[in-house]
Design a protein with these regions (language model features):
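Short capping loops/turns at secondary-structure boundaries
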Residues: 7, 11, 24-28, 43-47
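A cross-kingdom feature marking charged/low-complexity
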Residues: 36, 40-74
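Generic alpha-helical structural element
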Residues: 3, 7, 55-56, 160-164, ...
Length: 234
């Protein structure tokens, strides 16, 4: 709050200010943070150091992330939907994190290898196959059953369309998710060594759902639902 929210009025301004602070001061580790107002939602991913990328969330799709970078695409010319460190691509190219002449990569509209933010600035490790991928896979299966993905591979769509409008009840269910009634349900099977990390875990200190009802006055239109502790016990 002290370094961002008190200085901004919109979600876009919030993402832009935090990005400038990252450029100026740097950061020790990657993270993601969302900003919401009554018109837009922006989500910023930090790539450690002084690099960052922020995307405006599509209004007809949802976004799920674990403890890992999820963004892929970046179109510098699309100022309406993207903001980033000004040298995001150039730095990656200069330091061998991105090769615009990669013959095997998907091409952009200029005929160059498409820039992939996750590939350039993040990584996929063995731990992700049990700690991060399953949560993204599980919630996308919950909201979009038609999506067929291998839970062991990071090929999940960044944004996805839900099979139906997502309600507050759906979000509460999502925050309580622990691979319910499957072989990976650690609570059902009393398996303290279950490898898949659930969304709902005992070390959760707070669970938040933020709702913006733009047709109502600010005083009653913006609501935060908070559960103190793991979602499944709320």
């Amino acid at each position: 709050y002290n370094i961002v929210l008190r200085y901004v009025h919109t979600a876009r301004e919030g993402a832009a200010r935090l990005g400038k602070l990252i450029e100026q001061y740097g950061s020790a580790e990657g993270f993601g943070i969302g900003f919401i107002d009554d018109k837009e939602i922006w989500y910023l991913e930090n790539a450690c150091g002084h690099k960052w990328l922020a995307c405006r969330m599509p209004k007809d799709q949802y976004f799920v992330t674990g403890n890992q970078s999820r963004f892929r695409d970046y179109a510098p010319e699309d100022k309406e939907n993207f903001m980033a460190a000004p040298d995001l691509i150039e730095f990656a190219e200069k330091n061998g994190l991105y090769d615009p002449n990669d013959a095997e990569a998907e091409k952009d509209k200029h005929g160059k290898a498409k820039f992939d933010f996750h590939k350039a600035y993040s990584r996929d490790e063995e731990l992700d196959t049990t700690y991060n991928y399953p949560r993204v896979w599980g919630l996308q299966q919950m909201f979009s059953p038609a999506i067929q993905n291998d839970v062991t591979k990071n090929t999940f769509p960044v944004f996805a369309k839900a099979a139906h409008k997502i309600s507050l009840t759906d979000l509460r269910t999502a925050f309580r998710f622990h691979y319910d009634h499957t072989d990976h349900d650690p609570y059902l099977h009393e398996n303290g060594k279950e490898p898949y990390r659930p969304v709902s875990i005992f070390r959760t200190t707070q669970t938040h759902i933020i709702q913006v009802r733009k047709d109502l006055p600010h005083a009653i239109g913006h609501i935060t639902y908070v559960a103190f502790g793991m979602g499944d016990l709320s």
